[in-house]
Amino acid sequence: MRVSSSLIALAALAVQALALPVNELAERDTGLDVKLIPIGNTRVKAIITNNADHEMSFVKYNTLFDSSPVRKVQISKDGSIVPFNGMRLYYDINNLPKEAYKTLAPGASAEAEFDIAETSDLSAGGSFEISAEGSIPVIDGQGTKPTGSIRFKANVLTMDIDGEMASKVASAIPELDKRTRVDGQTCTGQYAQLLQGGLRNCVTYAQRAAQAASGGNAQKFQEYFKTTSQQARQSVARRFQAIAQECSSANQGRTIYFCQDIYRNCQRGLIAYTIPARSHVVNCPDYWRLPPVVNRGLDPDHGYVVVHEFTHATSIFSPGTVDHAYGYEQCRRLNAQQSLSNADNYSLFAADVTRN
C-alpha cells in the first residue's frame, strides 16, 4: 500500500468501544420465493414474493434488489463461471437504516430489473446460464433488526445472448484517471490520519490471525472456518500474511484506497466496498462513523473493515472472497467451503484472536 507524504501524520486518538452481544439469527428455507425472468438480450427481471402469513422485511443490500452493481446472479458459459467485474460491499448487519429494507405484506411481491452485461463481459455471445441462490436476512413483523435469514434458490435461466449488443452495454464501473496507492485527492486531513490508523490496526489483526491460523488453537479455527485441515489453515494464514504486507507497505502495494465515494455507490448503512477487477477499495461515510478501535468483542472498527475489504482483492490474494453472510451468527452457519470464501469470516476470526 503506497502512502503519499500527506498520510504520514500520526493517527488521531483511537476511540475505544465495547462490543454488544450479537442476536441469534434463525435460518429457514421457507417464506420468500424468488423468480428470474429474461426481458431482453442481457436484461433480467427478479420477482420476490412473501409466501409467509405475516409481514416481512428483507435486506436489499447485496441482493437482487440492490441498486448498486453488486453480484446479483451467477453467470456461466460452457460450464465455466463468467468473471464478475462489479463491487463487493460491507455493511454492519446490526446497524442498518430503514431504507436498507423492503417490506412485503403476506402474498405481496416486489420486482427489480438489471442488466447483467453491466458487471460481466458477455461479448463472446452465445448460450449463458443465469442462476441465483443464497440467504437473505429478514425482519419478521415490526422489528428494527434482522430476526433471521431465509435461504432461496431461483429458477435457472438459459439466455442466448447477442455478443455484439452485449459489448455496447456501458460498464457500471466507470474508468478513473490513474491514482496513487492511497488516493491523495480523497484521503486528506483527518481522513488521512484515520486511514493510517486503520491500516496499522489491519497489520496487527492480519499478523495475529496468520499466526493463529497456522499454529494456534484448532478449535478456534474450526469455529470460524468449519475445518481444521492443514491445507485450509495454511491457505488462510497465507491470505492474512498477504494482507498484513499490503497494509504495512508505505510506498508500494497492489490496491488503491479511496477515502471518499469516488464511484458514487455508497448508501446509508454501507461502510465500504471493493472493486476486485480494479483493485480499488472505497470507504463510505459510515466508515468514518465507526470507532477507530474496538478492544473487545466482534464489532467492526476501522482495521476490521480494511481486513474485510482486502480479502476481496484478488490482486492481494487469489481467489478473492465473496459475501455469503455478514456478522457472527450468520457466518457461523456457513459450511467449510463457504466459510473459507466469505470475507467476514476472516475479519471475525482476526478480531477474535486479537481482542479476546
Swiss-Prot record:
GO terms for molecular function: metal ion binding; metalloendopeptidase activity. Its cofactor is Zn(2+). Its EC number is 3.4.24.39. It catalyses: Preferential cleavage of bonds with hydrophobic residues in P1'. Also 3-Asn-|-Gln-4 and 8-Gly-|-Ser-9 bonds in insulin B chain. The active site is at E309. Keywords: Cleavage on pair of basic residues, Disulfide bond, Hydrolase, Metal-binding, Metalloprotease, Protease, Secreted, Signal, Virulence, Zinc, Zymogen. Residues 1-19 form the signal peptide. It is an enzyme of class 3 (hydrolase). One of its GO terms (biological process) is proteolysis. The keyword Mitochondrion does not apply. It comes from the Eukaryota. CDD domains: M35_deuterolysin_like. SUPFAM superfamilies: Metalloproteases ('zincins'), catalytic domain. Secreted metalloproteinase that allows assimilation of proteinaceous substrates. Shows high activities on basic nuclear substrates such as histone and protamine. May be involved in virulence. Belongs to the peptidase M35 family. This is Neutral protease 2 homolog MEP5. It comes from Coccidioides posadasii (strain C735) (Valley fever fungus). The lineage of its organism: Eukaryota, Fungi, Dikarya, Ascomycota, Pezizomycotina.
